[in-house]
A protein has these predicted regions:
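Conserved functional hotspots at enzyme active or ligand-binding sites that engage polyanionic ligands
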Residues: 1-114
Length: 114
């Protein structure tokens, strides 16, 4: 399990407005940190046209490399740490350009100054 990989995981149980159910996520945590069996992930959801106006949503076009079947969006606002026990199967991985866009969304959402 490495940064930029897309995995199908179970996010339930959830509370309130947390994104739920079994869905794809992208691993956003660094491969160089962490000794616990945890990964930091950002969930993917079906693409909707109005997401183009939301700065923390990154569009992802399905292709063979990423293993997605439909246009999706990475929701950086819903980033979270999850146990590797939630991971079901690897779908694919993202290209460097898409990963950079997701990283920039995380910088904005988390208020990190570069």
């Amino acid at each position: 399990m490495q940064r930029s990989e897309i995995w199908l995981i179970s996010l339930d149980p959830t509370i309130g407005a947390e994104i739920r159910k079994t869905r794809p996520v992208v691993i956003v945590s660094s491969d160089d940190v962490g000794t616990l069996p945890l990964k930091i992930v950002a969930p993917l959801t079906d693409w909707k046209l109005h997401y183009a106006e939301i700065p923390w949503m990154t569009a992802i076009v399905p292709n063979r490399q990423n293993g997605l079947e439909k246009p999706s969006s990475c929701d950086a606002f819903q980033v979270r740490s999850v146990s590797v026990e939630r991971f079901i199967r690897k779908l694919g991985s993202l290209d460097a350009k898409t990963m950079q866009a997701i990283t920039q969304s995380l910088v904005e959402v988390l208020g990190i100054e570069e």
